[in-house]
Amino acid sequence: MRRYLEHFLDLCKNRIFVMLCGVIVLFAIIVLRLFSLQIIHGEYYDESITASVSKTLPVAASRGNIYDRYGRPLAVNTVAYCVQVDGSVTLELNREERKTLATDLTDWLWADGHHKVDSLPITTSSPYSFTFKGTDEEKEKQEKSWKASIGLEKKQYKLSATECLKYLYEKYDVPEGYTAAQKRTYLSLAMSDDRNLMALTLARKLSEFGETIDDELPLDTEAPYAFQFNGNTNREKSWKQSMLMKGKELNYNSRKTLDYLRDFFGLPEGLPEQLVRDTLGIRYSLYLKRYQQYQTVTIATDISDKTLAYVEENQDTFPNVVIDTVSLRDYPEGEYFSHILGYIRQMTESDYALYKDEVDADGNPLYSQTDVVGQDGMEKLYEKELNGVDGKVLIEVDNQGRRMSVIDSTEPVAGKDVFLTLDSKLQKVAYDTLESELRTAVLRKLTGGGKTYASSTELFTSMINTNHISAQKMIQAEDGVQKQVYQKLKQANPTFSPTQDDAVAVAKEFLIDGLEKGSISLKELMLMMIEQENLSVTEEEKTSIENGASPTALIIKKLSNGEMSPADTGLDPCTGSVFVTQVGTGEVLASVTYPSYDNNELVNTFNNAYYNDLLQDGNTPLVNRPLKQKKASGSTFKMITALAGLETGTITPSTTIVDKGLFKDAGVPYARCWIYSNTGGTHGPVNVSHALEVSCNYFFYELGYRLGSTANGSDSNKAITTLNEYMAAFGLNDYTGVELDEYGPTMASPANKEKAVKTFNPDATTSQTRWTDGDTIRTAIGQSINSYTPAQITKYVSTLANGGTLYKLHMVDHIQNADGTLHSEVEETVENVTKFKEENLQAVYQGMYLVTNGSRGTLRTAFNDLPVKVAAKTGTAEEDKNRSSHTWFVCFAPFDDPQIAITVMIPFGEGSGTPAPAVAKAIIREYLGLDYTPTNTTMQTVLAE
């Protein structure tokens, strides 16, 4: 026994035996652990792993298209190439690739004058030392941490700064021939992690190739990189907290936040600001998907062939950067239809709350938070029809969230197509003619060829007021003339701050006041507008302005050749709207807003800068004017008063009323006929048709007053009750029924007067709110508190033209399935039918005919060259005593067989010539094909056996 023990002790002294025992013990532990994992807990871990590696990815369905009445495309999908980063593919740059990328970036930065890229914690000149800050203990800790981060072992922690530089030069293979400063730039880049080198390279190349980076970072993409929270401080704070900002960091402005993000993502210091912003856009998009790396991240869409070739050529370097195809939304007619179509965009939180409960036939959700949905117009209204059903791909991913394989897939189902009642050619003719006529009107003002003249001071004041010379951009500018003018503002107002609540208003007032007093010149304002890219000029033109050429002359030149729009000047009249319907169906043929916007700028890659400019534009291009701009109807209302008088027997078609100039029966202030106000004359005796021809206010004052006639005199309530009945018969008491969002009408009535008065004076007395004869007679000529949209007026004129049938207006004709079969159709809806006496209708029609054809008609020469007869009426409505009155024009055509009704409304358009009738005339010519010339005039005969 003793011998065995001695032998065992001898073995224990043998190193090989000890090592063998250790191996046996370790092997036993491994076997036991495997037994536990696979046998005892195998089922549990199997279920856990299976649940964690199966992920479902949506396959986007093709969105339905939108067409006009003839099948012309208005909203379609196009296929484009995009650059994506696939997080499931590992990026591991080798030594040579890292050197190539860092060298390329270094050479580019130095060639571009950026010599301060340096993230090394080492002084820039010999003798080199570390630049860590704090107590000795803190500095020692920082130094050790940094040395560990660059790959030094503990035994190398005593290396000096000079020795560390030498170590880095060798490790990162710093190119020969670089200066000391260039070497530091190179090292700052080469030491960045692989994702930063990739993002920096891509950001630089995408910018070089003219691409727009798809960006979710809520900072403007150009200096001064303002936040995109539209003043919502709660959203700003919440976002900052999501980026781990805290304490004082929550009060950082946008530029400090940019610096914070640069450090957060580990980008080198000293990089060009724009490159940092672009790179952060890429890094931030990847950061948002850090827990879903199986989902690719799109960083550029609709790329050029040059970008595609670059990505393909560098596939070995960046295997995680891929080219894919994507479906983009395209609006071929852009600004012509933007207010009707709207646009699509990735859904917001409020959108998701609206759509999250939508499910398909199997109960599966139809929407996810990353889906795009309609944000306005038809795109929003018919979202559920246009949106298809997404397909699915079931994939297997590893525990890092990276894609491994495809398990199963389901094909998507395309959305339905929507066909509108609108005629795109008619719409474009209306828009282009309206813009052309407004251009002519503004040019007359600037050149003194019209009734009113606009001075250079008025022109530039208008451009400041409408933000085409932006005070906001001026106070944010970092250089140029804008900065010089801003310094003038600071000298005049030392306490001014760009962050004060009324900063823009104060700056705008300073510019206008300075212009009037001469402390700010037209040249400075013109150069500001050029710097803000609100006016495109050649170098020669810019130099001529700098050398003293007339800014106004250049504006006139740009306006004349179409490089500048009338809306850009801000001078009245520079806005307008047109609405056209079929008189016998309620179909809308055209709905024009001017100025408009290009919805292509807001789809696919949302242009925040463009959208902010739209929001600040004083001409309100985002407003859908035909449906949401209400004005007093003026004399276009008089046909209703005429029919009310005729149908109630108050007058007959032959009844004459003598115009006395002043109408005194309704009390003071006395109402005046327009001709009396202008010339002191009168229209003399006129019947209803001739009263419409010359638009005699006195005739309709008298008629409105007579509608209240009783045995004891006049009853104003009786008169307005009668007028309200006929206003309702023409739809002026309700919405038009059109599918898009619209404002309701304001019909002059006792209830609406009381409401209006108490809105401004809650303590108004009964005598102040009661309805009077003065209210009635002013209602009879379309004034008082009457207020309607062009769509509502067109519905009224359409009803008049067809003899009394009130149709619900509609813009959608039918909806079609993806396979071409009919899904649904919008049928005509008759809301009311009023049986007017034929002789009464003819009397009113005759009056409207005389407007364009009578010897005294207000438009007797406007339609001379049109081969068809037109029934029309004009109207004006005053809103601001310092500006021209609004002008209305309504008509239906042809006179002997009415097919279409047209309304043109031009705010502040009185005295600008006849733009509205010219627009209507162009519409009639297009609709009736009067300018159509066959492209093939050769008669062809086809013989069939």
Give the ranges of each region predicted by the language model.
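Membrane-proximal periplasmic segments of bacterial cell-envelope enzymes
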Residues: M1-S577, V583, S596, G704-A711, ...
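Beta-lactam-recognizing serine transpeptidase/beta-lactamase-like catalytic domain environment
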Residues: Y81, F130-F132, D136-I150, K154-Y157, ...
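Short, hydrophobic-biased amphipathic alpha-helical segments
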Residues: I303, T307, A916-I923
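Short, charged, low-complexity patches
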Residues: F419, D423, Q427, Y431, ...
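Short, hydrophobic alpha-helical segments
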Residues: L438, A801, Y927-D931
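Short, gly/Ser/Thr-rich active-site loops of penicillin-recognizing serine hydrolases
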Residues: T821-T829, K921-E945
